A protein has these predicted regions:
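Generic N-terminal amphipathic, Lys/Arg-enriched alpha-helix
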Residues: 1-13
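Glycine-rich, proline-tolerant flexible connector loops at the mouths of alpha/beta enzymes
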Residues: 12, 16, 35-85, 114, ...
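A structural motif corresponding to the C-terminal end of an alpha-helix
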Residues: 36-41, 89-105
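Conserved, mostly hydrophobic/aromatic
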Residues: 9, 28, 118
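Residue-level detector of conserved catalytic or cofactor/ligand-binding positions
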Residues: 146-156
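Hydrophobic faces of well-ordered beta-strands that scaffold small-molecule active sites
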Residues: 6-8, 45-49, 105-108, 124-128, ...
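Active-site-adjacent beta->alpha loops and helix N-cap segments on the catalytic face
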Residues: 17-19, 88-91, 114-116, 128-146
């Protein structure tokens, strides 16, 4: 029987820090000991990160909106969101770390502008964000990469 393929979602939990992202990768790569039922769960198979291009995602008014939450990383919503983003090079750094631990690397690319990341490395799989399931221009660009399991001919 095949085992379930488990992906550890990093998302924005790295708070804009490569070191935190790598720590999460370290944790995902370890088995989990569950003491109540005396189980040892195997490590996850992959980690997933998300790459966004805020200039394609947010309007000027959204970017410049004051953002004074106690948990804000900037004076405006744009500054806050920009702080949380890792660069292409930082994604590559996390990718290399994950691969060194034997993990697959999955990437959600949220816009065509994010395809620049693919100049540095090729993730094992691409994931489509649920909000982009009908974003045909993005889906076509992602399918053309031939990363993962589907091709342009297989699209619906």
């Amino acid at each position: 029987m095949k085992s379930t393929y488990i992906i550890g979602e990093i998302g924005q939990n790295h708070n804009g820090s490569v070191d935190i992202a790598k720590l999460i990768v370290d944790l995902v790569s370890r088995p989990v000991r569950e003491e109540v039922f005396n189980l040892e769960l195997r490590p996850m198979d992959a980690v997933k990160m998300t790459k966004r291009d805020l200039s394609e995602e947010l309007t000027d008014s959204q970017m410049n909106r004051p953002y004074d939450s106690p948990h804000s990383f900037g004076r405006t919503y744009g500054e806050h969101r920009a702080y949380l983003e890792l660069t292409d090079e930082e994604h590559f750094d996390v990718y290399k770390h994950a691969k060194s631990l034997g993990l697959d690397f999955v990437e959600t690319l949220c816009s065509k502008g994010c395809m620049s990341l693919l100049k540095l490395f090729t993730p094992d799989r691409l994931k489509v964000a649920s909000r982009d399931l009908t974003n045909l221009p993005l889906l076509e660009v992602m399918a053309e990469t031939k990363i993962g399991r589907a091709s342009c001919r297989e699209r619906v």
